[in-house]
């Protein structure tokens, strides 16, 4: 039962950190490359 409580207390924390860092990464990519649908340097 203690392991279950440990899992339930760490999984939300880890997922919050993961999704927060992923959102920050996407925000910074969109800040550096504003229109990600067209990359002019690939043409």
From Swiss-Prot:
Name the chain's protein.
Photosystem I reaction center subunit IX
* Function recorded in the entry: May help in the organization of the PsaE and PsaF subunits.
Q: Where does it sit, as one GO cellular component term?
A: photosystem I
Pfam families found in the cross-reference section: PSI_PsaJ
Which family does this protein fall into? Answer: Belongs to the PsaJ family.
User: In the UniProt record, does the keyword Lipid biosynthesis occur?
Assistant: no
Q: Does the keyword Chloroplast apply?
A: yes
Which residue spans adopt a coiled-coil conformation according to this UniProt entry?
Answer: none
How does the entry describe its membrane topology? Single-pass membrane protein
User: Entry's Gene3D superfamilies?
Assistant: Single helix bin
Cellular localization per UniProt: Plastid, Chloroplast thylakoid membrane
Main localization (coarse)? plastid
Q: Which GO terms describe its biological process?
A: photosynthesis
Underlying gene? psaJ
PANTHER family in the cross-refs:
PHOTOSYSTEM I REACTION CENTER SUBUNIT IX (PTHR36082:SF2), PTHR36082
The source's domain of life comes to Eukaryota
Which keywords does this chain's UniProt record carry? Answer: Chloroplast, Membrane, Photosynthesis, Photosystem I, Plastid, Thylakoid, Transmembrane, Transmembrane helix
Q: From the record, give the transmembrane residue ranges.
A: 7-27
